[in-house]
Design a protein with these regions (language model features):
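Short, conserved loop/helix-junction motifs that constitute active-site signature segments
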Residues: 145-151, 175-176
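C-terminal motif of bacterial Sec signal peptides marking the signal peptidase cleavage site
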Residues: 11-13
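N-terminal beta1-alpha1-beta2 submodule of the flavodoxin-like/Rossmannoid cofactor-binding fold
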Residues: 15, 19-123, 127, 134-136, ...
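Beta-strand-rich cores of mature extracytoplasmic or soluble domains
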Residues: 131-135, 152-155
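Short, glycine-/small-residue-rich phosphate/pyrophosphate-handling segment
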Residues: 155-191
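Short, surface-exposed connector motifs at secondary-structure boundaries
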Residues: 123-125, 150-155, 181
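A short acidic/glycine-rich loop-to-helix N-cap element
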Residues: 194-195
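Sec-dependent N-terminal signal peptides
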Residues: 1-6
Length: 209
């Protein structure tokens, strides 16, 4: 597979993290937006081949990352897997701000609802998440620690209000030293309407389609 990297990830761009303020709560989580299309609002198990070697795992609070995961699935035929904590997060962004920050400070690993039966069948694994507090939400840390990613090609994608990647790519590299980590795709919340073409260009450059 010929791989061309098209996105340069700038690590540590936000030295103070994506800290929410009274004026800008979107720095913690994505704003909830209308689906780009009916097909982009994909339910788990709705599409994808059972014999695919591509997995698209994602965590989504507002629905934005879910939409982006659906776009990737539509173009790659990969299997979707939602990373869901056993205890759902509140819809109140003020409460969520405090909860998610405390989880990060305490290095919590929230228990997840679903389990992959066999990750060995996948050669390429996309990992999607919003930027929370300059890093991945803690359920994504749980997911990455529960499976053996040795020898896998891992490709991150993120949705964000501010801060883009934060420290998340560094975290993935540290957690998965035996994996090949390719540069990913970052989509700001207001760019979701134009994301399908960006996803297509990105996947073509990576040699995925």
């Amino acid at each position: 597979m010929g791989i061309v990297i098209i996105i340069a990830v700038t690590l540590g761009a936000c030295t103070n993290g994506d800290l929410p303020t009274k004026e800008s709560k979107d720095s913690l989580v994505e704003k909830k937006v209308e689906p780009v299309s009916e097909t982009s609002d994909v339910e788990i198990g709705e599409s994808g081949s059972d014999d695919t070697d591509i997995l698209i795992a994602y965590f989504s609070w507002s629905g934005n990352t879910k939409q982006l995961a659906g776009m990737i699935q539509e173009q790659t035929g990969g299997e979707l897997f939602e990373i869901e904590p056993e205890t759902p997060y509140t819809d109140d962004i003020n409460e969520l701000s405090g909860i998610s920050l405390q989880e990060q400070r305490d290095n919590i690993r929230p228990a997840l609802i679903s389990v992959l039966e066999d990750i060995s069948q996948y050669e390429v694994i996309f990992i999607g998440y919003p930027n929370w507090w300059n890093n991945m939400p803690m359920p994504v840390f749980t997911f990455l620690e529960e499976y053996d990613f040795s020898g896998k090609t891992v490709i991150p994608f993120t949705t964000y209000g501010n801060g883009v990647w934060g420290k998340s790519v560094n975290s993935i590299q540290e957690m998965l030293p035996e994996s090949v980590i390719l540069d990913g795709l970052a989509i700001q919340e207001h760019e979701l309407q134009n994301a399908p073409s960006k996803v297509s260009e990105w996947l073509k450059e990576l040699g995925m389609i």
